[in-house]
Amino acid sequence: MLVIFLGILGLLASQVSSQLVGQLRPTEDPPEEELEYWCAYMESCQFCWDCQDGTCINKIDGSAIYKNEYVKACLVSRWLDKCMYDLDKGIYHTMNCSQPWSWNPYKYFRKEWKKDEL
């Protein structure tokens, strides 16, 4: 019985730790431990990429793209269970942090980098 209880408690603890909690003031530089979360639902945010010499490497999965209109400066913030992306010029996205969904108005600008294209 104790083993079952501890197993359930461990399962609940792992679910709680994966959810974002607390307030996050608007920032272009979210905490490192939250980067995977924010980049999963709005991949074109500039903080998700390391860009140099016209090529950008994704900080989460290592994919490479050409730097263009796809990579945008983003402000992210969190208040209670609302996670928000602000892309400036009236483009923003709000979602429940506990029930996130992907959103990317710039997906058509993404151009994969290929090693043989120089």
From Swiss-Prot:
One matching Pfam family: v110
Keywords carried by this UniProt record: Early protein, Glycoprotein, Host endoplasmic reticulum, Signal
Gene Ontology CC terms: host cell endoplasmic reticulum lumen
Motif mapping: Prevents secretion from ER: 115-118
Keyword Signal: yes
Chief location: host cell
Signal sequence annotation: 1-18
Coiled coil: none
Localization in the cell: Host endoplasmic reticulum lumen
Sugar attachment sites: 96
PTM entry text: N-glycosylated.
Induction field: Expressed in the early phase of the viral replicative cycle.
Keyword Oxidoreductase (UniProt): no
Family recorded in the similarity comment: Belongs to the asfivirus MGF 110 family.
Its biological purpose: Plays a role in virus cell tropism, and may be required for efficient virus replication in macrophages.
Protein name: Protein MGF 110-6L
